[in-house]
Amino acid sequence: SKLEELRQKDGPDSAMLLGSAKFNNEQAYYDRKFAAMFGTNNIDHQARIWHSSTVAGVANTWGYGAMTNSLGDIQNSKAIIIFGANPAVNHPVGFQHFLKAKERNNAKIIVVDPRFTKTAAKADLYAQIRPGTDIPFMYGMLNIIFENGWHDKNFINDRVYGMEDIMAEAKNWPIERVADVTGVKADLIVQITKLYAASKPGTLVWAMGLTQHTIGTSNTRMAPILQLALGNMGVAGGGTNILRGHDNVQGATDFGCLSDSLPGYYGL
């Protein structure tokens, strides 16, 4: 075959396999196995330019680059804060879980987005943030949380390493500075933080609006830190939940259509 001729002539790394977020799990797995049989790690798919910053940021916190809870588990949430995502339009079926949480638990939906979207129209609170200022916004929330003692001290003591460094940095983000940087009124930031901290379990959701920045990986590091501070991890209705852009971005990533990991995120 042409592939075998190429392999014999120029070596296995002369070829590259491009997987797809439209693959189902089995197809993604076989694509990775074919690359291994061919003798190359030159394999990738669309997640490289979509959510690679999420994978890097989240994997450095949890050890793997995936959402921590299922989409259906959002029905168990009592607070849902959404950064840079518009699931009412882009994930209309999945968004039914958000609405079910409102119906079942009187869950509060908070949207942080530069645009007023159809998702924001369903929100209890909406913050029109300046693009690229998500980190100051989250540090402002953390500053309020720590100052008021709303953080989960037992969870942090038992489960979290390095939170004292976050506490120290959060002091550099008083509410007035955060309001100036983000363009969100100080009263609204306090209102959002108080509502989210008081309504547990809370889930934090994001999509491309958080990742597609030069600081995308740093953005996706901050989101889990906020959840850890409140003890919203390891519980139904909590977690950090990333909305993907195509049918099976997560599955194709889980099953190894990547040049730097094997199925199940075993690093190379």
Protein language model features and the residues they cover:
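Cofactor-pocket helix-loop regions in the catalytic cores of large enzyme subunits
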Residues: S1-D247
